[in-house]
Amino acid sequence: MNKYSDISESARDVLMEIGNIGTGNAVTALSSMINHRIEIERPNVKIMKFEEVPAMLGGPEEIKLGVLLELSGDLNGMFMFLISTKFAQTMLDKLLGTEVEDVRNLDDMSLSAVCEIGNIMCCSYINAMTAMMDLRVHVSVSDICIDMTGAILSVPMIHFARLSDELLLIEDKYHFDDQEVVSHILFLPEIHSLERIFKALGEEYEG
């Protein structure tokens, strides 16, 4: 077994619980950051094939903002936080009082704010995962990319598709005021890290 889709229901439940804990921690931090109450639905944790991801995110030509963090230590790989233009516009309005017409022309302060939001979200899941699996990791400085979904995904997909044709995707839906916004987190582990995850979940790994 060397695919997410091969794991047992009990291991899937652990992944779901990691998603729940990460989401709870993230929404608490975001609410404090923007000083505004945020409601969040139960996260949707999915195991998906690479080729299915662009359609899941609205199509390859949909403009997204991506925040990338690399992991090293007990786990090596990449976390990617993807948000829509609507999500970015809403959060920047709440956080900075900035009305953004085109997310491709954000100033440095707005870019920094989006990076910080991505850091909060990804690190909430990373902390939940490493605590539950008793692992130690180092998280890189985040990087941000604003482009079409297909372009943002192309580099990590080329690299990680050699290792596995599946990834872990976490979808979160947020509600504040009368708005609903959605974000996605992708986790792409290196092959030896996938082996460690399987072992931590009590699953047998076959390379």
Q: Which residues fall in each region the model found?
A:
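Composition-driven recognition of glycine/serine/threonine/acidic- and proline-rich low-complexity segments
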Residues: N2-V27, S31-G207
